[in-house]
């Protein structure tokens, strides 16, 4: 619906959206902060730090339903957004659902809440509910999750400042997963996802965006005996959100899902019977075609047609073709492809598997979104229940992700059973 963010300069922001022959321009000040967020969420699919450098040409990859890429839980979020190969948690449905098959408990449930972008707005929230049940080693493990991302209440205005009403846009998804241990140290999983994106913009000709997607993932976890106990090496991959495009106007135009390739490695090392640390590293790359435009690296001002790609041409790229070409279609060549890879590193210290302290860093190239932040967090486990908290610290001065908090409450079925006995 919102085809382009035209301007981002402090509080004064304007952008255009098109509806067939209708072109409206929305421009205001205070209330436009939410419109900025909506424009980014729906069209840019990435949250840019408010840095203005004349020598930087921003070329983020555009997707629909970008909230699917927001890490929902306080454990992975406190470690720089890692989770592809880290120790399995109850929120593994988002990171790598095949990890559920490696969990010792019969099942569990987790609820996470994130007041998102509190530095900009006060009513944007992400709620995430996930759980799993281990049927048996022979029949595998079932898992599910529900995600709801609310963009709060937004006042719609035309470019004259006249109010057009209020909107309450949201994005949500529901998915079911199955995972199974295929070997002593290796498991695989799949998840099927239903996605709905409601703009609530009260514009004729636009509807709720509906889409379907799937995840395919694997996890390798091998114990290694060391002098202080048993360490563990973890390796994993997750190809997430492989699926249909999403459209708000019944196919007239459509956006790619945020299909993502994530690979990770982890190493858990025990100092003694009570103390251990875990080191985690994830690499992520969107498997979505780059869009060549005058804003892209390498644009030749004297020959705009060289890099220009019309909306129609881009929308005609199939999902399968887009996945494979996403590794070689960046306008800036191989060097720009490398810029599309984000890096997450995380460290976790645990005492007696009851007290946890976490820290991490997430880095994304400035041309591809500039989401750069440090993170920290802590957790406490008491029998069946675990409470985790995560906190983000933006690298840049005006990073909208700065001061973001995450809260996660989890309970374990085996622990709950022991508590009842």
Name each model-derived stretch.
Residues 1-63, 415-421:
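Cleavable N-terminal export/targeting peptides
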Residues 51-421:
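Subset of outer-membrane beta-barrel
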């Amino acid at each position: 619906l919102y085809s382009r963010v035209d301007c981002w300069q402090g509080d004064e922001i304007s952008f255009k959206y098109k509806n067939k022959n209708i072109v409206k321009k929305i421009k205001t000040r205070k209330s436009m902060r939410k419109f900025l967020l909506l424009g980014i969420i729906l069209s840019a699919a990435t949250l840019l730090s408010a840095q203005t450098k004349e020598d930087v040409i921003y070329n983020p990859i555009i997707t629909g339903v970008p909230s699917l890429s927001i890490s929902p839980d306080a454990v992975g979020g406190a470690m720089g957004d890692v989770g592809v190969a880290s120790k399995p948690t109850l929120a593994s449905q988002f990171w790598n659902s095949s990890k559920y098959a490696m969990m010792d408990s019969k099942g569990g449930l987790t609820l996470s809440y994130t007041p998102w972008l509190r530095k900009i707005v006060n009513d944007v929230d992400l709620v995430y509910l996930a759980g799993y049940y281990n049927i048996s080693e022979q029949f595998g493990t079932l898992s599910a999750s529900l995600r709801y991302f609310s963009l709060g209440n937004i006042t719609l205005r035309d470019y004259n400042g006249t109010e057009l009403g209020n909107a309450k846009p949201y994005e949500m998804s529901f998915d079911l997963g199955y995972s199974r241990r295929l070997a002593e140290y290796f498991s695989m999983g799949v998840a099927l996802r239903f996605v709905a994106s409601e703009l609530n913009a009260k514009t004729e000709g636009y509807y709720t965006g509906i889409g379907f997607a799937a995840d395919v993932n694997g996890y390798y976890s091998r114990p290694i005996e060391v002098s202080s106990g048993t360490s563990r090496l973890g390796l994993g991959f997750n190809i997430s959100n492989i699926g249909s495009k999403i459209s708000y106007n019944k196919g007239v135009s459509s956006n790619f899902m945020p299909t993502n390739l994530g690979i990770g490695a982890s190493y858990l090392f025990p100092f003694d019977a009570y103390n251990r640390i875990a080191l985690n590293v994830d690499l992520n790359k969107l498997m979505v075609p780059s869009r060549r435009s005058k804003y892209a690296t390498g644009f030749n001002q004297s020959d705009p047609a060289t890099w220009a790609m019309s909306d129609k041409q881009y929308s005609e790229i199939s999902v399968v073709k887009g996945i494979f070409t996403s590794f070689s279609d960046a306008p800036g060549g191989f060097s720009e492809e490398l810029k599309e890879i984000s890096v997450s590193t995380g460290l976790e210290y645990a005492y007696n598997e009851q007290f946890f302290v976490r820290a991490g860093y997430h880095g994304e190239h400035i041309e591809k979104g500039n989401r750069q932040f440090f993170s920290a967090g802590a957790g406490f486990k008491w029998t069946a229940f675990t409470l985790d908290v995560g906190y983000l610290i933006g690298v840049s001065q005006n990073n909208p992700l700065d001061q973001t908090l995450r809260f996660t409450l989890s309970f374990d079925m085996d622990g709950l059973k022991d508590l009842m006995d």
